[in-house]
Amino acid sequence: PRSGECRIFGEDIQRMQPVTRERIALLIENHVQYTFMNIEQIERFYSAFYPKWNKEAYYELMRKLKVAPKQKISRMSCGQRSQVALGLILAQNADLLVLDDFSIGLDPGYRRLFTEYLREYAKAEEKTIFLTSHIIQDMERLVDDCIIMDYGRILIQKPVKELLDTFTRYTFKISSPDKLPHDHGRAFAVNGEL
């Protein structure tokens, strides 16, 4: 956006009090540091910085995602590192979780598992989650309201249910796309799918 103001919990974000900042957990891309630690060590390290730390939330997610407690972060895949970062965010026990492309590196199965877990967690713990994602289908069960933007301009802003009721998606399979007239063939997706 090129104008306006941003307020969180009633405060301007540029002049926010430290006590208000404690209520916010932020996850950005490429988010795991201290890769020489294992998941137990990094949990203990982070816990010292957050007064409302909830280690049960961290370890519950690690168990659900089957991440071994002594596993070194440096030996983890990108997806596993994302899982650790997500656990650290949940353990901060913040009122507002801001997740920027949280699913980067997670395969579809783990994305689905984490999305389900996040939905249950937010409801049970009464948390607000603000997230961005390029994978819309994962968000249908998680998001109440949706804003679709294009280079800072809002294209659509409405509740997800209303958005889904407004638009319909069709998929057509063409057995022989090479037999379509030349000028029509370019309008169809590659691999015979529309």
Show which residues each predicted segment covers.
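ABC transporter nucleotide-binding domain
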Residues: 113-194
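Conserved ABC transporter NBD signature motif
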Residues: 4-12, 19-20
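Helix N-cap at the start of a conserved alpha-helix in ABC-type nucleotide-binding domains
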Residues: 108-110
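Catalytic Walker B motif of ABC-type/P-loop ATPase nucleotide-binding domains
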Residues: 97-101
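Short loop immediately C-terminal to the Walker-B catalytic DE motif
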Residues: 103-104, 136
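ABC-family P-loop ATPase nucleotide-binding domains
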Residues: 22, 28-84
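Conserved coupling/switch loops of ABC nucleotide-binding domains, chiefly the family-specific signature
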Residues: 2-5, 151
